[in-house]
């Protein structure tokens, strides 16, 4: 059976890896060698230190940027160049649509040559042009641009499967016009995990969805508060959480050291800010009630146990007192009988 053509392989993708503005990637090429390469934003002379491209354009306007494709391999490589709609994954990382999925937005606005040949340990600076349609809606639009190599791998059934490995970066375009950033909180649910040690508090978990209801890219932060305890999100070790217009993302925040009090008042606050140009522009805070029921069973059981001990002690004391009074009465009666007997 003949090997698939590059076009056919692109349609038979079983997996595609994409690194955006990250460390150089390594992949097996169609040949025998290993290909290592990086792709970063550039100006006409070379890499310019940016992590990705941010641009603000009017409807109908065009702008040219550059990408630097650095071949770190020891042989010449022909890289396939492509642009596609961009999106944020559920974990907050940026990606772009795979080659076999058609773009519908900003990925269609970018024109770039189909391929570029780069010699060993050389860098090619390639221009690309973003042309905003006349009818583009105001606000933020995401795309990605990448250089890729195709390789072949054997599937479990022995068939040859094409794998595309891509390295690229974001191209974030803000179309001028009225910017209306906003966000909402939906589908809030809370749960509580008891500590069966009555002297230790439990922890609450608040799960919710943040929806970007405006037309601007948002950086989302916030906090959940329960019974006076607070937990912020994202955590200090987590990446920034960005939402494109129309995006929604599910979060779970854990609040530690919460005492059960039958009903625990809890509040959720989401404080988004506009990302990109105008970064830090405040947006109305979204607030939602997250109160939940938390019956203090360990404490109630402990109190019940203490109550039983106290009740048992009081009952024992009363019983002892009654027995003592009974014995004293018997002794008095015996004394009276002895006193009544003739001498």
Which role fits each region the language model picked out?
Residues 1-29, 306-318:
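Secretory targeting and sorting signals
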Residues 38-73, 77, 184-201:
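Beta-sheet-dominated interaction scaffolds and their linkers
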Residues 75-99, 125, 131-182, 258-302:
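Terminal connector regions
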Residues 100-136, 230-261:
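Intrinsically disordered, low-complexity Pro/Gly/Ser/Thr-rich segments with frequent PxxP/GP/PP motifs
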Residues 177-321:
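Membrane-proximal extracellular "stem/stalk" segments
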Residues 322-343:
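Cytoplasmic C-terminal tails of single-pass
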């Amino acid at each position: 059976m003949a090997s698939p053509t590059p076009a056919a392989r692109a349609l038979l993708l079983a997996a595609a890896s994409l690194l955006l503005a990250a460390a150089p990637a390594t992949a097996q090429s169609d040949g025998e060698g290993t290909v290592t390469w990086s792709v970063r934003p550039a100006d006409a002379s070379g890499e310019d230190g940016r992590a990705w491209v941010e641009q603000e354009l009017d409807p109908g306007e065009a702008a040219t940027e550059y990408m630097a494709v650095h071949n770190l391999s020891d042989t010449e490589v022909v890289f396939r160049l492509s642009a596609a709609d961009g999106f944020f994954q559920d974990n907050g990382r940026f990606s772009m649509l795979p080659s076999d999925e058609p773009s519908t937005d900003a990925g269609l606005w970018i024109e770039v040559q189909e391929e570029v040949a780069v010699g060993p340990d050389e860098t090619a600076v390639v221009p690309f042009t973003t042309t905003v349609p006349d009818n583009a809606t105001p606000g933020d639009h995401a795309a990605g641009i990448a250089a890729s190599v195709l390789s072949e791998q054997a599937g479990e059934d022995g068939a040859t499967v094409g794998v595309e490995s891509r390295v690229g970066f974001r191209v974030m375009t803000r179309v001028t016009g009225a910017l209306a950033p906003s966000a909402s909180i939906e589908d809030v649910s809370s749960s509580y995990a008891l500590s069966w040690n009555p002297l230790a508090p439990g922890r609450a978990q608040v799960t919710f969805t943040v929806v970007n209801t405006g037309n601007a890219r948002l950086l989302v932060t916030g906090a959940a508060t329960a019974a006076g305890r607070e937990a912020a999100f994202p955590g200090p070790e987590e990446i920034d959480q960005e939402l494109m217009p129309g995006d929604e993302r599910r979060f779970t925040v854990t609040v530690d050291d919460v005492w059960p009090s039958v009903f625990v008042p809890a509040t959720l606050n989401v404080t988004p800010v506009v990302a990109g140009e105008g970064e830090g522009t405040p947006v109305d805070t979204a607030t939602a009630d997250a109160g939940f029921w938390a019956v203090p069973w360990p404490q109630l059981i402990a109190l019940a146990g203490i109550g039983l001990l106290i009740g048992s002690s009081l009952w024992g004391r009363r019983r002892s007192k009654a027995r003592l009074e009974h014995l004293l009465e018997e002794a008095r009666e015996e004394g009276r009988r002895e006193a009544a007997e003739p001498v």
